[in-house]
Amino acid sequence: MSKLFKIPLILEPQKEGGWTVTSPVLPELITEVDDLQQIDEIVRDAMNAVIELYKDTGKEFPSGLIAEGQKSPVWFESLIFAGR
């Protein structure tokens, strides 16, 4: 079953093009994206790999990153493509 996570991401532009995506709270989350319009899909795949890693190693996933069931608002920043 899918869960909703709140995870800060750092997008670092690369000289050769594209971006490296990491998270300061999940050091295992490292991926690259060529086109920022694909970031949701790419990060979702990387996040699924991190979740699987935690399960396989028996490491407990940080509960503070799970957004479901919270009674308070979730701060959400996003990149939005708009205009022409």
Positions of predicted regions on the chain:
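Short, charged, surface-exposed hinge/linker loops at domain edges
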Residues: 1-7, 41-84
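Short, positively charged
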Residues: 2, 9, 13-15, 33
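Short aromatic-glycine-(Arg/Gly/Cys) micro-motifs in beta-strand/loop hairpins
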Residues: 11-25
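Residue-identity detector for glutamine
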Residues: 14, 37-38, 70
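Intrinsically disordered/low-complexity terminal segments and short unstructured peptides
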Residues: 19-21, 30, 56
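Proline-rich low-complexity regions
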Residues: 24-27, 62
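A short, exposed loop/beta-hairpin motif centered on an aromatic-Gly-Thr core
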Residues: 27-38
